């Protein structure tokens, strides 16, 4: 799938009456009845992610179906439109999920995404408790590559956590869920929205101070710590206590790790964002840290490195790496129906102008 040519500026969202308009776009031919919706493979605040098979060619996709009513009720349409905008910019990076196309009905929004069935990093961590350093290094390197690419587009990710890191059928990382991304953040710029997931919030976010790209490198440190030790670095079941720990408790690294790993964790999880690794030269500082010295970054980017773990999926219908809580849920028949257009208010339609997107072409994944 191709988006707009490299170097072509994307249209800037315009706002009126709280609605978000990404500019002219349309996908009039796409509709829910194009797919057989087979299984629920994920759930979120506003809808579900389903394994879907396109009737025309038998291709498998992950289709994220969101309820407009729920989004509008919480006034979150800007996050949904930001996710759509960011997804269009990410299609050329090997470790970011690709948007094939998007469309809408009067009641729902549909993201048609790459189908990735190697499981969430969270799923594998829950099962294995922790990873050895070589495996953690491989995943951290691929995630850092993806974050560095987003930063090169002036995008802060802001929600890095194991649940948003998928593995593909070969075991490579795929970063997903761009709803909290902030676009248009230049290297010297800051932003101040309080958002993220409690276990991975950086101190500057908790202090409600202006923050910059270094917030993502804190999150990388938190995820790496969790991969190596089984829990986030300042974890407590009491969220208030966890926030206190993030703000004031010195980082405690259990024994058994290399000096390089300990130094990287200390550098990424520095409470002063100005002193944090990545705060000056961004991704270049991460790449050059001694912990990543075994990594050939060019080979990594081109997927010439063999992943340390193979999910061993037998094909698209192999759902063993998805939570049975999702896959055993019945698929609502309404998801695959094209409803009567008269049934929806014009307000819901105007709130998502520019959401629909049709690609110039449509490639099929290798697995």
UniProtKB/Swiss-Prot annotation:
Gene Ontology molecular function: any one: protein serine/threonine kinase activity
CDD domains: STKc_SGK2
GO BP term, pick one: response to oxidative stress
E.C. designation(s): 2.7.11.1
Residue positions, PTM Phosphotyrosine: 357
Gene3D superfamilies the UniProt entry points to: Phosphorylase Kinase, domain 1 (3.30.200.20), Transferase(Phosphotransferase) domain 1 (1.10.510.10)
Effect of residue 356 to D: Increased activation
Active site per UniProt: 159
Span of domain AGC-kinase C-terminal: 293-367
Primary location group: cytoplasm
Domain annotation Protein kinase: ranges: 35-292
Phenotype upon changing residue 199 to K: In a lung adenocarcinoma sample; somatic mutation
Region spans: Disordered: 1-26
The keyword Kinase appears for this protein: yes
Cited function: Serine/threonine-protein kinase which is involved in the regulation of a wide variety of ion channels, membrane transporters, cell growth, survival and proliferation. Up-regulates Na(+) channels: SCNN1A/ENAC, K(+) channels: KCNA3/Kv1.3, KCNE1 and KCNQ1, amino acid transporter: SLC6A19, glutamate transporter: SLC1A6/EAAT4, glutamate receptors: GRIA1/GLUR1 and GRIK2/GLUR6, Na(+)/H(+) exchanger: SLC9A3/NHE3, and the Na(+)/K(+) ATPase.
Record-stated family: Belongs to the protein kinase superfamily. AGC Ser/Thr protein kinase family.
Protein name, entry field: Serine/threonine-protein kinase Sgk2
Organism annotation: Homo sapiens (Human)
